[in-house]
Amino acid sequence: MAYTELNIELTDEQRAIKEETHRFSKEVLRPASIELDKLDRPDDVIKSPLFWDTMKKGYDLGYHTVFIPDTWGGLGLEPLEVHLVLEELGWGSADFAIALGVACFPAFFASMVPNEILAEKIIEPFCEDKDASIIGCWGITEPDHGTDTLCPGTPEFRDPNINGQVTARLDGDEWVIEGQKSAWVSNGTIATHSLVYLSIDPSMGMAGGGICIVPLDQPGVRKGKPLDKLGQRALNQGEIFFDGARIPRDYMLVEPESYEALMDITLATANAGMGAVFTGVARAAYEEALNYAKNQRVQGGKYLFEHQAIKHKLFNMFMKIEAARALSRAAVIYNMNNTPPMTEYSIAAKVFCTNTAFEVANDAVQIFGGYGVSREYPVEKFFRDARASLIEDGANDSLMITGAHAL
């Protein structure tokens, strides 16, 4: 059962966008992610023709440019349409929804501070790509820094004793990059370009950072092995090492004077997007459980749904999903339309929606009983994917502390 769209102001075009994305997710993303999830080694995932065929199909439809304006060749979606697309992609596969979303980060941030070189070398080639030959990654976490990098506006962000492990120094007309990004870099070992967050002025603490684009096919760049993890196993993640990598001066998008403001935009964009994606994951788990209870499983001589305890559980799941959609949609729409963003709402959306996805998936497993932990049904994958979401893009407990600073 698909949810009922309560926004009666959706245009026919917006409904068509939603339906087309849902069809792609149902026919391509979900089957592929389930098959790739069964592979034992993460190396096997990125060597699989199925993985690359799925990425290419996503690129061919432009889902790698969801956040990029049409003036640069992106899909040019309105904020509401972005939410519709992200939820449907998440319904199909959190793995691929995140991979396609993160792939655009270098080009997306370049489009916010464009120049002729960035347009020619980064933005336009990425938007024109139809075969996933240009893939971005988000190089923000480090071996000693995770969610603590995502705290703009807090006293800790300006503590000179806390600094990033990746650094940049200017050498003539080039920046020289040194250091290591952690194993949690999404798309890390398959990316061609990285959006790198680094330290330029350590006396300012984390606030003395910069954001740059680093082509990864150059001397001085080395990638680690793909990370083997519990959930979202089709989402490639891995370390990146910089040892004297060089970039043109124009590839440094943000320097310390505007770093904190851009970090705020980063957090608002990523967290709101995660809220939309995991609303989709929650919905996927709920729909599987509802169908199983109403049409498949008989217990005590009647379908599971006829038992009051199951009705109560399913309606509780339904309520949570509707609330998650409302919050994440509001955060996406407001923060894509306004600068500076209200980041606390994006944080609230990320925390609430990922918690909802985990709780709903957990309830779905319980409704399925023994089959809930069997790979015969997809709810166990939704459960594992949702569990990972409580940590990625900022651990929920820590994000709530960051969000509280704005209250």
Language-model segments: residues:
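A short core secondary-structure module
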Residues: 178-222
